[in-house]
Amino acid sequence: MDGTNRNTGAEGLLGILCCGLERSAEQRTAIQLGDRSQYVGLSDIAQMLDCPRAALAGKLYTPEYRSTDEALKHKITFHRDHWFERGVHQSLIGYGLSPLSQLEIEIRYGDVPIKAHLDFTLVTDQPQPTVRILEVKSTARLPATLSESYAMQIGGQTALLKAYWNHPVFNIIQETGEVLYHRTLPESCQELLDVSLPDDASACDIQGWVLCLSMCDAKAFGPFLPEDMDVAQCLDMASEFWETGVTTDKPVS
C-alpha cells in the first residue's frame, strides 16, 4: 500500500484490539486453564485426531504472524468461542438454570497429568439424578455432522466424569474467585448447588451435548453417553501425546 494513503488511525485502533485480545486470552487462560504446559487437555487429544503434528506444534510453539491483520483474524476466531460461551451462559441463567462453568477434572494416568475442562455442567436430582455436559463450539458454518475430534472431546468428558465420579478430582473456580479443589462430583454439587447426587454414577442419567454456533444459527449434537467412549483409549492417547512432547527439545507449552 502507498504510504501516503495509509490510515494510521485505523491501523492503530486494530493494533489496540489485537494486543488487547492477546492479553485478555493470556489472563483468561491463566485463570481458567492454568499452565497448559503441565498437562494434557482433552482438546489436545481431540486435535490429534485431526492432525497430530499440528496438535503438538500448537503446544510447543507460539504462533508467529506476518502482519497485524493476520494476527487479528486468528485472535478473533479464537475469542469467538469465549464470546459465545458467555452468551450461552447468560441464556442458561435466563432460563432459570444454575450451570457449573468450567468444571475441571484433574487426574493422573501413570506419570501423565490430564485435565478436562467442561464448558457447562447442568445438574439436578429431581425427578431423578441427571447430569448434562454442554460443550460450546463456534463455527463459520454449521456442520452437517459433528467432527470426529469434537465427538471425541465430548465423549471423553462424559466418560471421565462417570469413571471418576466419586474420586476427589473435581475442581471449580467460583464467581468470587475462590477455588474448590479435590472434591468428588457429588460433594461439589452439594456444596455449590445444594443438589444431592448418588454415590454411584450408574444411578445417574449422564449425557453430553455439543452446541455449535455460527453468527446467525445454532445446531445441537447428541446425546453422547459415557459408554460410547473407551476411557482406556482416551488415556492412552493422552500418554502418547505427553511422551511425544516431553521427548522433544522443548517442554510442552
Give a label for each model feature.
Residues 251-253:
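Short, active-site-adjacent segments that bind or coordinate small-molecule cofactors and metal centers
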Residues 1-132, 152:
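Metal-dependent nuclease catalytic cores that hydrolyze phosphodiester bonds in DNA/RNA
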